[in-house]
Amino acid sequence: MSAAADVIVLSSSPDRIPNGSPVLPAHDPAKLFDLSPPSASPSPVRSPSELFQISTRSRFFELETPSRNKENKTPKEPPVRKVNTTSKAKSASSQDKPKRRGRKPASESQTVLGDSGLAGLAQQSAPKKTAGARKKRVDSEGKRGKATNRTIMGRVAKSGNVQAKPPQEKIMDVSTPNALPPTKPASGVVSLEIDGLQLETAMKRRIDWTPTKDTTARTVESSQQEVAEANPQSFGSLLSEYGFNDISSAQSDVRNLGDDGPTKRRRIELVDSRLFGSSKPASHDIDDKNLTEDSQQKQPEPKQKPKKQTKKFTTLTARVTASYLNNSHEGSDSSSKETTTSRENAATSRTRGSKRKGKATSKPKEPEFIVLSPEAAAKSLENQELIFGTCSQLEREDSPTSLKELQAAISESERYAVAEPSPLSSTLCATPTSRFTTARGLWSVAARDLEGSLIRQTEVVDLVDTPEPAKMTTSTNDSRNEKALEDAATVPPKEPFDLPQSEPPKLKAIPAAKKEPSPAPGLPTIKASDNLKGTTSQHSKPQPKMPNYNGFTDAELSRQVASYGFKPVKNRKAMIDLLQKCWVSKHGKGTTFETQAGSQNTSTEPTPVLTSSEPNTSQKQPRKTATSRKTAAKSKTNPDSNPPPKINSRKTPSSSDATKAPSIQSKPTQPPPIQSLSNVEEIEDSEEETLPSPFRIQNRYTPQPPETRQALPVSKTLYSPSRPKPRTTKSTTNNSATLNQKQPDLADQIFKAMHAQPAGTPSRPSWHEKILMYDPIILEDFATWLNTEGLGLVGEDREVSAAFLRKWCESRGICCCYR
């Protein structure tokens, strides 16, 4: 007793002594183990070895006490084990003492039970129970060993279900070690083996410790059951949607069912679609009545809506997307509900035969425009005026006059835009049949088709059937295009048709006449030239013919030049060109048709080149004179063509009103022949510097006075119109022509001077060869050569500055730079 008390006193706490003086200290060491919970956790691992002898009994004793006191279950176990082990060791030393010691711990265990919470039990009743319990324990010791194993299993369960039994078992546990200590270890071995199996079950307990899995699984299962209960009703509604039965009320019901679900996923539309399905078979009949009533009231409205939409169908895209417009509006507008109800009526009609007929009659009206038969679709497209491009994306009201008005406005704008540049484009149109094809710059090729002729917008105007806007445009463009029409080769053939006036028609007939001798003019050009022949022949009969200056001697040529008031020219070709120009300016082009034919025969290279296409005569004259050095025919034809537009500019103001109106009226007929007639660049391969500059090309498409246009034609520079020549003193027309030709003559003189220069060597190429090789021309050196030697070869007394040469080079696309 004393030894046991000493052990208990060491581990006891003074606070709990008053409850039971001998027992409380035994309970306190358990609290000390409570202070170290990690020791309690490994203790069950150690249990197989420790329980092998006596610890199992102590466990049974402890388990029963903490079962009532859940707070101190684990801590009470190890201290009792220690006390039992000490008592067992002492019992082994002396067999008489263990009975007493067994009694004392039993009383202690009873006090522990009273401490753990059994306040109703008295300390006196406890010893009585212990006596009865001792006898029972002695009777069944082996059974108690098995029971201990059973209690261990119960310990693994530790649910606290049985609390009254453990106090009795504890008393028996204390008595059992006293009876048979040697036999208990054998039974303890068996119990340890069983304990090992029970440890596996403990691991299962630990798996069960995670409450979230059990709770989530249970809640999900319960929610799934609820959803399953809701699904049988909503499943039919899903099928109803496949039948295009859309009910706003059904949707709201389904949403409510989705809200009942525990998880948010029940609210997802996909889950809602499942919920829709079950309601159809169950409440399909009820829904049918509501649907039919709603559909009968709302069916006329969707009929009106497609009509509104059809009014907007003016484009291909609207036609194609017409069948999908209802679906798009259903989601956004309240009208969608009406359309859906009509569809639902059609679906419900399938279930009921009588309703099917009524709904089928109302529904086919929608698919008529939604889905058309191939024939009906083709007819609808044929009846519709289609606009392609960006306009097809626009929705406009269907009006038969709107498209016509649009076309009329476009035609007027095209006529208005084309009327001004038309003479330029006609003059710049090149015939693919010309003898000489020159390498053209990128900007000159840009505005031409595959055949080399200019792309013209007048053809687009011809396609329009409305002649009235053309008349309006011609009248408005008369004032603007007076000079343009005078300079354009398109106008001259038109004027001789309508008005056979003395000089202007003669001058304008010349380009067509020149176009005939061209080696291979187009068919339309031949027709125009034939018409011009009849008109020009009438005028040319009374007028003298141009003499063949090629047959004159140098002395005769110099006299003729002096007669026109020009200084003597050294170069024979230059004199012939000058005389031809002067004679044409004096007598008119109408007489030069035959003489030009003769001169072209005598000339080395006859060409229909830019003559017809040169409304800007001042520019083309110098260019053609430059070409005449290599080809006399070019220079001869060029002077003929150059003065007539100039004379037209002089003479047309007098008769411009009479001549221009008829010419404008005849424009739509003539432009195509002009395109074939005009050869934009009739220049040899060596004359690439005369290619049109980008500035000229811009001027081609912008109507300008003849002075600015002189830069536009392929052959001439911008600067040619600025310098007039006062050499022609015999007639005002000659003076005006020479004034306009003076600067072009200077540019042509520069061009001629380059060709007059003898061919250079590879080490020192001529200026013309440098230009052909795209070598940069140093302006100072070029000006020095022209002023000292080059212009002298041509008989030009004037001098040229570097700035002028820079403009001259830039106008022809020649690479130049300052030193």
From Swiss-Prot:
GO molecular function per UniProt: 5'-flap endonuclease activity
Protein's GO biological process: DNA recombination; DNA repair; DNA replication
Residue ranges, compositional bias (Low complexity): 36-49
Keyword S-adenosyl-L-methionine (UniProt): no
Stored Pfam families: Slx4
Biased composition (Basic residues): 352-362, 621-633
Recorded GO CC terms: Slx1-Slx4 complex
Span list, region Disordered: 1-187, 208-371, 467-553, 591-741
Entry keyword set: DNA damage, DNA recombination, DNA repair, Nucleus, Phosphoprotein
Location relative to the cell: Nucleus
Biased composition (Basic and acidic residues): 59-80, 256-272, 282-304
Biased composition (Polar residues): 83-95, 212-237, 313-329, 337-351, 532-541, 592-620, 650-668, 729-741
PTM comment, free text: Phosphorylated in response to DNA damage.
Keyword RNA-binding in annotation: no
Quaternary state and interactors: Forms a heterodimer with slx1.
Name of protein: Structure-specific endonuclease subunit slx4
Organism field: Aspergillus flavus (strain ATCC 200026 / FGSC A1120 / IAM 13836 / NRRL 3357 / JCM 12722 / SRRC 167)
